[in-house]
Amino acid sequence: IGYITPLFMILVGVGNGIGAGANSLISRFIGAKDKKGADSATAHSLILSIIISIGFMVLFIAILDPILKIMGASEVLNYCKEYGVVLFIWTFSLIIPTIIGGIFRAEGDVNRATLPLAVTAIANMILDPIFIYGLNQGLAGAALATGIAGLIGLLMQIYWIYVKKNTYLSYSLKNFKNNMKMYADILAVGIPASLEQLIMAILAIIVNFLLTVVAGTTAVAVYTAGWRIISVGIIPAVGVGTAAVTVAGVSYGARNYDKIKTTVRYAVKLGFIVSLITCILIHVFAGQIAYIFSYSSNSSQLAPLITKFLQLMCLFVLFVPFGATAANVFQGLGKGTVSLGLTIMREFILVLLFACLFAFPLGLGEIGVYIGMLAGGFIGSIIAYIIIEIYVKRLIGGQKHGA
């Protein structure tokens, strides 16, 4: 499953990215009080989700063999294919619900945007043992459970849209007219947003390599376990930033640039307060959290190492509201390439630069990698926040000058 995970994460990234693109475009139409345009953008988003799902399903199944061999999975190739082929057949249930979730966010229906995700996660946990052990389906059963769980979330969305018919936006294709510019506008944000998530995955691979070089595989195990907790810790701040996509898009469409300024500052303030609380909790309960990943006799020696990692890297959570808000607001404004540029600057340039600097020339080894990640993340996030503040200030100034 580990060899298939990177490909699975690409699908998740594509779904989230295109969902952000749909959210951005639709919210701008809503802000401009163009209901017809918003409905058209909704229909185009739906069609695009189907096209992309089919495309990635065919592509991933076709290239699965050579990709797995390149990744070094030759010895377990048949096991990987047993899981991967079944999983990719269900690509539609992984991508389409995420994109529809972005559409729900655009119309401000947060409950319907998030409820299917929660139901899917719970259904997956329930179905996994049933298909893997109860029905003796093994790896194929794990993939089938993931696909069916996603389908359950999709069916919930279909029920709201086509049975209850009580959504603000129309998903009807009855009077649909194909507009290539609509697709281009969605992809202008969607592709960069998808690439941002791919960059994060690549960064994790590079960090693993650096840790292997300076400290060995034990450091990688510590980082992998600890970073899961940090990833959970940043979810609230990322959630606030995601909400800012819709608000910024609506405000931009309505040419209410002062509200964009308010959105940026409120999102950062709220995100920072939540992140500060999260940071304190992780630091205080680091030992107890570390025990979760080291309760067995084989991994008990990792507990103090994971504890130290969490007590240091919990500081990373504090920087996220600044960078995430800036990136998401730029997405809401339809400036996906700017958002991507900020992510590349922060992750590929600053984080890696400082991680290598502290680990090698300064000779700090493993701890140097972590300090470098903190330094790069802090500087990159602050730069991103300054850039969005300057951009919004110019929008407001240009509007006043034009008036």
Q: In which residue ranges do the predicted regions lie?
A:
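Small-residue-rich hydrophobic transmembrane alpha-helices
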Residues: I1-M57, L94-A113, V222-A286, V320-S339
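Short alpha-helical transmembrane segments in multi-pass integral membrane proteins
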Residues: I26-W90, N136-I191, A248-L315, A359-A403
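Alpha-helical transmembrane segments of multipass membrane proteins
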Residues: V58, P66, I99-I103, I122-I130, ...
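Transmembrane helical elements of multi-pass membrane transporters/channels
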Residues: V86, T120, A149-G153, Q157, ...
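Short runs within selected transmembrane alpha-helices of multi-pass transporters and secretion channels
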Residues: G19, N23, V86-R105, A113-N124, ...
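Small-residue hotspots at the loop-to-helix junctions and early N-terminal turns
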Residues: G2-P6, C80, G84, A143, ...
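Helix-terminus/linker motif at the lipid-water interface of multi-pass membrane proteins
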Residues: L68-S74, I130-Q137, A201-R228, V232, ...
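Hydrophobic residues within alpha-helical transmembrane segments
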Residues: I4-L7, V14, I47-I51, I89, ...
